[in-house]
């Protein structure tokens, strides 16, 4: 919509059918999560579909599928209603989300906000680094350590270490 004068725009939304079938093609697909609230990645994506998905990217968080163990790693543990996600697939696949379980308690995200001096501007071309382990002075990282990514002297990503396979945008 382009308006060249002051005016009012009245938009009426129609809820998405929760049984919508998403037809994903090979590689990158931008899709929505059609439910209110939150649902865990492992529970809302049908089990027989998960092997076709390598990763899911959200705003500032990612989930990486370990096909050997069937586990998801990274800070994106829950899909959130009204948000969009990039699904990275290794083959064409069609699926419908499993609806969230009523009354299911959402656990806190492992992602903590970093101090302002380590903040960065979110990019439309964001990438993620998945860090399995790291040391400082020969000592393993702990939950108070921050991983910082630079491009020259500009901070382009940062994340508190939260354990194995920390995603750093």
Give residue ranges: language-model regions.
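N-terminal exported-region signature
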Residues: 1-142, 146-169
């Amino acid at each position: 919509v382009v308006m060249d004068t002051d005016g009012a725009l009245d938009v009426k939304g129609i809820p998405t059918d929760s049984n919508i079938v998403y037809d994903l093609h090979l590689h990158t697909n931008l899709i929505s999560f059609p439910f209110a609230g939150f649902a865990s990645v492992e529970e809302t994506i049908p089990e027989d579909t998960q092997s076709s998905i390598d990763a899911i990217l959200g705003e500032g968080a990612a989930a990486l599928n370990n096909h050997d163990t069937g586990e998801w790693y990274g800070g994106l543990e829950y899909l959130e209603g009204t948000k969009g996600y990039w699904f990275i697939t290794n083959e064409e696949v069609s699926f419908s989300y499993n609806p969230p379980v009523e009354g299911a308690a959402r656990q806190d995200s492992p992602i903590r906000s970093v101090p302002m001096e380590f903040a960065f501007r979110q990019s439309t071309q964001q990438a993620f680094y998945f860090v399995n382990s790291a040391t400082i002075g020969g000592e393993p990282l702990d939950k108070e350590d921050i991983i910082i990514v630079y491009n020259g002297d500009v901070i382009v990503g940062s994340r508190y270490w939260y354990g194995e396979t920390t995603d750093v945008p």
